[in-house]
């Protein structure tokens, strides 16, 4: 992995768009195991040739990235972003290109070098730690998962004290109608965990579901980075609704619509939920007196995420 310094993400290996395309096509550059397969490289060539103008624009964009080598180690399928559904079933190729370009522009502009390096690491960038009942520590982390790369460039997850991943939400920074936007393309629980583990975590966090904790981190991150909107894909526009996946038995395991609505989201005509950047909280007057202490503890726990994020990124 390339070394990251305060001079910020500079590479000593300038590359042209043609050289990048040629190196990937010939197998001279193999950022991940998928590129070891000739069939994968052949598909890359043919699909690229079907959209020559966008291919040229995308290869030129990637070739200009000073941190390309480092990013390809974590996102080896970056060069094929235009070839598959991405973020939402109705995102066209130009929207995909613009979204990925904008995402990494935001990262470069707002992350300190050490934070960017942590984001690229296997352990990810720790955003916050929160203390539940019995002093159990829950960790909120931002990282990259190649297996989730169709749903977004970055993922925020929460782990319990044993290190179990409870929930992940995947997103990309993009522009939507001229406004900077954090766009959520995927949400995953952990089907490998017993349901009791999630129940225990919820109880430890004073009744806050793990995905609600991650959603708080998502919104606080958007606020911290001056991202104007938070949006999310609906059940109907999830990438698995794309014709590409109709015959592949892809299943959406979460009810996206219900969760986005529960945090105040409203769906637009394109099938995207618009979520308040500041999630609503009940006032004391709305809470039964016997439950007020519990709600105060919930909000104090969520506030610790905001407090820790406020110390991160470029001021």
Task: Give the ranges of each region predicted by the language model.
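Terminal substrate-recognition subdomain of acyl/acetyltransferases
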Residues: 1-153, 157-167, 175-180, 189-197, ...
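Conserved acetyl-CoA-binding loop-helix of GNAT-fold acetyltransferases
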Residues: 200-202, 206-219
């Amino acid at each position: 992995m390339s070394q990251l310094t305060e001079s910020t993400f500079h590479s000593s290996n300038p590359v042209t768009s043609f050289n990048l395309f040629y190196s990937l096509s010939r197998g001279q550059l193999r950022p991940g195991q998928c590129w070891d397969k000739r069939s994968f490289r052949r598909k890359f060539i043919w699909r690229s040739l079907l959209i020559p103008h966008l291919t040229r624009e995308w290869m030129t964009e990637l070739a200009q990235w000073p941190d390309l080598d480092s990013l390809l180690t974590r996102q080896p399928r970056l060069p094929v972003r235009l070839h598959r559904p991405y973020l939402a079933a109705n995102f066209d190729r130009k929207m995909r290109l613009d979204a990925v370009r904008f995402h990494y522009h935001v990262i470069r502009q707002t992350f300190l070098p050490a934070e960017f390096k942590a984001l690229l690491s296997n352990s990810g960038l720790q955003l916050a730690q929160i203390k539940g009942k019995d002093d159990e520590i829950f960790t909120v982390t931002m990282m990259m998962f190649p297996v989730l790369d169709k749903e977004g460039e970055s993922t925020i997850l929460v782990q319990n004290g044993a290190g179990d991943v409870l929930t992940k939400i995947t997103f990309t920074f993009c522009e939507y109608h001229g406004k900077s936007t954090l766009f959520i393309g995927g949400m995953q629980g952990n089907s490998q965990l017993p349901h009791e583990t999630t129940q225990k975590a919820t109880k430890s966090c004073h009744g806050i579901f793990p995905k609600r904790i991650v959603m708080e981190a998502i919104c606080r991150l958007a606020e911290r980075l001056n991202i104007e909107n938070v949006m999310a894909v609906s059940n109907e526009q999830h990438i698995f609704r794309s014709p590409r996946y109709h015959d592949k038995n892809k299943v959406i395991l979460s009810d996206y619509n219900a969760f986005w609505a529960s945090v105040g989201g409203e769906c637009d005509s394109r099938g995207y939920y618009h979520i308040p950047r500041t999630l609503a909280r009940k006032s004391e007057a709305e809470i039964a007196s016997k439950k007020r202490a519990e709600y105060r503890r919930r909000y104090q726990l969520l506030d610790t995420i905001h407090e820790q994020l406020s110390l991160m990124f470029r001021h």
